[in-house]
Amino acid sequence: MRPMRRFISGVFVVVLAAAFVQTASAAVHRTLVGNFASPVEVVAPPWVRGSTIYVVEKGGRVVRLARGTRTVVLDIHTRVSSGDEQGLLAATFNPHKRVMWVYYTNTAGNSRVVRYRLNSGGGHVISGSGRIILRAAQPFSNHNGGTLRYHAGHLYMSLGDGGSACDPGERAQNPSTKLGKLLRRDGGTWTKVAYGLRNPWRWSFDRKTGDLYIGDVGQSSREEIDFVPASRVALPRENFGWDKWEGSLKDTCENQGLRGSGTLTFPRFEYDHSVGNTVIGGFVYRGSNMPAQRGRYFFGDLSGWLRSADARTLGNRHVLGFQVSDLVSFGENSKGELFAVSLDGPVYRLVDN
């Protein structure tokens, strides 16, 4: 089993992509932006100009790419454990200040979120500005989650259930732990916005509507995309069911059942492991360079396929006419243009054919 196949999912399943073909689409193509060292995410704050992006590398670096020039904004490789599903996994920015948050696994195998201040040009972190704002002990090396997003004045993040199979510690349903949760930073504390998540690796807010889309990686039966309308995001209401449910199927794990007062919420869309093995949540396209794709949700699978769907229903799915090997993330720049990230190194921009 190749380590890249173990990254995120911990499960290798042979993919029968033909079983998932909906409507073929030749309208979207890819163009290579560049190659990086095990990239896992592309992000960009609204205060950068043009096509500038920041690439998060699993080994511990954040690299800015601006007009063809690369700058290492942050290098914390000596603090990061990057084996298996660990590493520097996510970054995001304050849209109003030169502030960046990063999420990584430290050398003890535990999760950290750290806030850094940037110089005025956003080209490097200010020395000594790092401040830890989240500590979470990880009992296993897999199911680390996680994405960071800044939305409506708050920082959000996700954590997996702590790892192993069948959530042996029943953490996703335990309201007293941060594991298996979607969290929101309220002042100096973290509020649990949603729970019952297995490994919410990649998720996003629709920049126009505020709706939330979560790609939650499954165990043996289902890959799922969970949907929360903007009107419900601010309230801790959603229980996505793990490990009592895997998608819309009752799980075979021994468990204590559902806990807490949240509303059991089934996926907006799911697929089984004859189709793929690790869902990669994406973005609703709101850019200008692919006008026919506006309002469509782009997502994919670690096995390499990419799809788009109607953002509200996740129906009317289109197959993109190319693959990205070891697809680990989608990204969005300040203008809403989309990127696809391969753990093998390439970062691609999605463009009209």
Regions found by a protein language model. Give the residues of each.
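Bacterial N-terminal signal peptides
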Residues: 9-19
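Surface loop/turn motifs at the tips and blade-to-blade linkers of beta-strand repeat domains
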Residues: 31-37, 74-83, 134-140, 191-196, ...
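Conserved beta-strand position repeated once per blade in WD40 beta-propeller domains
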Residues: 41, 90, 147, 199-202, ...
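Beta-propeller domain segments
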Residues: 47, 56-59, 86-88, 157-317, ...
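Beta-propeller domains
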Residues: 53-74
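Asp-box/WD-like beta-propeller blade repeats and closely related beta-sheet repeat scaffolds
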Residues: 112-149
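Conserved blade-ending motifs and adjacent loop-strand segments that build the rim/top face
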Residues: 315-334
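Blade-level signature of beta-propeller repeat domains, shared across WD40, Kelch, NHL, RCC1
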Residues: 329-353
